[in-house]
Amino acid sequence: MGGMISQVMVANYPSRVKSFTMISSTASTPNPFNGPEFKITRQLLKRSAAKDDIEGRIEQSIKLFGLIGTPDTNYDTPEFREDMRSYIKRGGDDGGFIRQMAAIIGSKNRKKLVKSIQTPTLIIHGDIDPLIKVKNAYQAHKLIGSSELIIVEGMGHLLDKNAFKKFQSQLIK
């Protein structure tokens, strides 16, 4: 959702932005053709409807991250569990997660707005992103004519250290 918000900001207030990086984002409203696979949608719904205690919500998060992250990444670690526990306690309930999902699904198509972006733009997307399909990155690259596109081999929707190393130098330019 941060990518969606930043697209609007960069398009509407270009004088306030020197450069723009889109990571795992889309200019389109999510739909069955450009959005997540069914198993991910199902897990998002389970996570959204979680009425579990904190440990149950952590388990739902581990399952979701396992689906949308980089394959073979172990999210069932003490560190991840503690991070999730902290986030869940800080947030209180899952209402924010539900509102975020509703905002994403209800968002307007931003293609025309994104096409107006003149700010130097770097688009980064994982080639195996199951949440926002990689074709969305190619579409954004086409819309923002002066953009640079990096497709990261083996990267899912979530950014991990190994994926970051693959484009770190381009990001720091």
Indicate residue ranges for each PLM-predicted region.
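Alpha/beta-hydrolase
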Residues: 40-112
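Flexible "cap/lid" loop of the alpha/beta hydrolase fold
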Residues: 18-51
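Short glycine-enriched nucleophile-adjacent loop
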Residues: 3-14, 20
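Acidic catalytic loop of the alpha/beta-hydrolase fold
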Residues: 128-132, 157
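Short alpha-helix in the alpha/beta-hydrolase fold that links the catalytic acid
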Residues: 119, 133-142
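Core-facing hydrophobic residues within beta-strands of well-ordered domains
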Residues: 17-18, 147
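Catalytic active-site module of serine/aspartate enzymes centered on a nucleophile-bearing elbow/loop
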Residues: 146-173
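Short beta-strand/loop motif that positions the catalytic acidic residue
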Residues: 117, 123-125, 129
